[in-house]
Amino acid sequence: MALILTDEQQMLKESAKGFLAEHAPVKEVRNQRDADSETGYDKNLWPKMVEMGWGAILVPEEFGGLEFGNVGMAQITEETGRTLTASPLLSNAIISVSLIKEIGNQNQKSMLLPKIASGELMMTLAIDETSHHNPERVSMIASENGERFILNGTKRFVIDGSTADKLIVVARTNQDSHDKSGITLFIVDKELSGISVERTKMVDGRNSTFISFNDVVVEKEDILGEKHKGFEPLSNVLDIANVHLAAELLGICQETFDRTLQYLKQRKQFGSLIGSFQALQHRAANWWSEIEICKSVVLKALQAFDENDARSSFLASIAKAKLCEIAELSTNEAIQMHGGIGMTDEYEIGFFIKRARPAQMLFGDHNYHVNKFASKCGY
């Protein structure tokens, strides 16, 4: 498939660009940070996104969605990278929707997907338990007790966990913390007895949550998918999430480049525009070339998921690893080429590095995905 957008996808991209420029410009990052928002994002923005149909893009048409695919959705996530827009788009409309439509039963799909699409329901994934992403190693236990399960354990770095109505909890239904076949997913109401949520403000101003489960009782019907068989679909959806994170990082790379290029054309030093200095020209040219490669890498990975390509997992790790690398290059170069003013809070360029670093770490950093790719290749 050609690495170009369809007319409809390009229209969605332009629509997202215009909407975010009007309703969520980069200056809103400072406003949300200074307001110390409990949600970690503008609570008035998400309903507007839902009105734009963004909550329904990955939802099948039979459940009130648009079914526009990952390539379409990524045009939005890329633009949110350009404007640093915080929202539950990733946790709710991408990860949760993808898991439910892939392994949910008919009742779960009909009950949950229309509500997510309409903005009535907020969900997120609770998976990580340590400071490093490792979906294979799950220590949280789900003990079977008749027709019920009792959950005990903790989850860290749960994105939008403080605002979600329900959690998709990854737990172990056997005793071996390294056994992939013993992982089960549960849909858990966050208000159940025994659940405690501790909000943490991250460097980008968004929320991360630490959630404790102490003898939390859930029903067998709350299992998402099949008992003991949650790892494979979970891994697939984590790949999808990582490609969308790569798309967001691509937006960050492009915006930092564009802003820095304008600065190089305006800032004078030693009587000359600094953009005329050959050393900076070479660095900028290398930076631009890397971004162009990233565009193709991300689009190819997105197309692979929409086409059910067997190589999708490989391509997801390539995309995330590459964008982690170039996002680091982009944010570092942006600050360095801006000089001292790039380090000041009054200048917006510093906000991009503060968002890029958490996005790079979420669901596996550069090293994690390089190792994952190498392992899949037999090394």
Show where each model-derived region lies:
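Long, acidic (Asp/Glu-rich), low-complexity accessory segments flanking structured domains
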Residues: 215-232
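Flexible, small-/acidic-enriched active-site or ligand-binding loops
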Residues: 137-139, 189-220
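Short Ser/Thr-interspersed hydrophobic loop/turn segments at strand-loop and sheet-helix junctions
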Residues: 53, 74-81, 171, 188-192, ...
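Short, structured patches in soluble enzyme cores that scaffold and shape functional sites
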Residues: 127-129, 155, 171-173, 187-190, ...
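Alpha-helical interface subdomain recognition
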Residues: 1-87, 95, 103-107, 115-120, ...
